[in-house]
């Protein structure tokens, strides 16, 4: 975990249904510090005595700063109902928000975002409500690139990764040999992150004999699981992906509640 800061500079060359009511402390805003500056986070705390397994959620590139997101909030709430301390890190806290059409800025900011995530994981290490040995990443698009990068750099801190339509930056492929278990979820008609990146990750993890699963959704585009993006949303694929995600988390975080 401590090694994230040391190698994040390498990333400068690296080319994102739920219950109606919840039995936990709901979407709570907080912050931690990274490099002496604040980073906004939101968390949902499950009922019962901890320490709990935890899931760190990372948004995609389209997230706006300080805007919240009801769909991420729903996911956070459902995961808390399943017994996970769930934290949503707003990693744009120290940079401007960027979009898919800004690759140069994205490349420059990537190490900053990764350092923020590093600091967030450090804060979870010290949180008495969290079991630091059972922490997973749940990433979407750009958030998946960050999740996989964190897993490649320091797999000992991360027990599992669920990645929706992302990939592993080529500069970090060396980390595949010790990557934690990964669930790959991708649409074969993705116009933003080509499905070839999912297949490349699958081949790399297979070569390194790392545990992983992959599901490619036929006809699905990018962000197929977000109702707010109606043009790409597919309810059946979204539900299937969420079911696979929660089963994968339960299996790899040894969550006895589900």
Predicted segments — roles?
Residues 51-60:
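Short beta-strand element of the alpha/beta-hydrolase
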Residues 184-186, 190:
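Short beta-strand/loop motif that positions the catalytic acidic residue
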Residues 129-139:
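Alpha/beta-hydrolase fold nucleophile elbow
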Residues 208-258:
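C-terminal catalytic histidine-bearing segment of alpha/beta-hydrolase fold enzymes
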Residues 24-50:
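N-terminal cap/lid segment of alpha/beta-hydrolase-fold proteins
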Residues 106-127:
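Alpha/beta-hydrolase active-site loop
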Residues 62-71, 78, 88-112, 226-228:
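Cap/lid segment of the alpha/beta-hydrolase catalytic domain
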Residues 144-155:
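Short glycine-enriched nucleophile-adjacent loop
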